[in-house]
Amino acid sequence: MALPAGPAEAICALCQRAPREPVRADCGHRFCRACVVRFWAEEDGPFPCPECADDCWQRAVEPSRPPLSRRLLALEEAAAAPARDGPASEAALQLLCRADGDPLCSACRMAAGPEPPEWEPRWRKALRGKENKGSVEIMRKDLNDARDLHGQAESAAAVWKGHVMDRRKKALTDYKKLRAFFVEEEEHFLQEAEKDEGASDDDELADPADRFRSLLQAVSELEKKHRNLGLSMLLQ
């Protein structure tokens, strides 16, 4: 709720200025209403104290739940960075500048001008770093799985390539055999035709129709023989 600023508590814990529309957390820290709204803009709840990260509102709902500051202590230590100008108190380094990631002390906040700098609490940055680390691990696992699948695909492609080459060699061999057979049968047919032509010269009175029928029968037998041979080779 909005409270008037007293003389001893006239500084917002976030912007280090006199609070405008001051609000006070249950832990006793005072803030500007705009600073608190800005601090909690990315939060869905629970809403801890921006200064000490104490979840006093959450403890009222869940009494057995430990304070947020204790639950995130390890993450705060992992994300903490040294002060840029020397040692400073822990309370003065609760915020990190969004621009360069360095700790944001009270002096920097007071010298920032009319508009306060972009800041965020250290524990929130620690949580985000933990989430990013988990995402990196998932991406690394997906990459390893993709490499394994790629290796399996290459092995399968090599096996199928070997099968195709074997079938190609076999088909080429069968083609050469079939072509040699056709050449041999063609020579045999020409020899038979020459013999029939010589016999017809000796017998001038032979009927041309009979000669044509005999020649046609020889051609049919040759085609049948070729067809049977080709079919047998294809079925091997």
UniProtKB/Swiss-Prot annotation:
Ubl conjugation listed as a keyword: yes
Residues found modified as Asymmetric dimethylarginine = 98, 109
Modification after translation is described as: Ubiquitinated; undergoes 'Lys-48'-linked autoubiquitination in the absence of growth factors and MAP3K1-induced 'Lys-63'-linked polyubiquitination. 'Lys-48'-autoubiquitination leads to degradation by the proteasome, while MAP3K1-induced 'Lys-63'-linked polyubiquitination results in the stabilization of the protein. 'Lys-48'- and 'Lys-63'-linked polyubiquitinations occur most probably on the same 3 C-terminal lysine residues (Lys-195, Lys-224 and Lys-225) and are thus mutually exclusive. Other sites of ubiquitination are not excluded.
Q: Which UniProt keywords apply?
A: Cytoplasm, Isopeptide bond, Metal-binding, Methylation, Nucleus, Phosphoprotein, Transferase, Ubl conjugation, Ubl conjugation pathway, Zinc, Zinc-finger
Gene Ontology cellular-component annotations: cytoplasm; nucleus
Q: What top-level class of enzyme does the UniProt entry assign?
A: transferase
Superkingdom, taxonomy of origin: Eukaryota
What InterPro entries would the database entry show? TRIM/RBCC, Znf_RING, Znf_RING/FYVE/PHD, Znf_RING_CS
Family annotation (Pfam families): zf-C3HC4_4
GO biological processes: positive regulation of cell population proliferation; positive regulation of DNA-templated transcription; proteasome-mediated ubiquitin-dependent protein catabolic process; protein autoubiquitination; protein K48-linked ubiquitination
GO MF terms here are:
ubiquitin-protein transferase activity; zinc ion binding
- State whether it acts alone or in a complex, and with which partners, per the record: Homodimer. Interacts with JUN, independently of JUN phosphorylation. Interacts (via C-terminus) with TRIM7.
Q: What does this protein do?
A: E3 ubiquitin-protein ligase that acts as a coactivator of JUN-mediated gene activation in response to growth factor signaling via the MAP3K1 pathway, independently from MAPK8.
Q: What is this protein called?
A: E3 ubiquitin-protein ligase RNF187
Q: Which organism is it from?
A: Rattus norvegicus
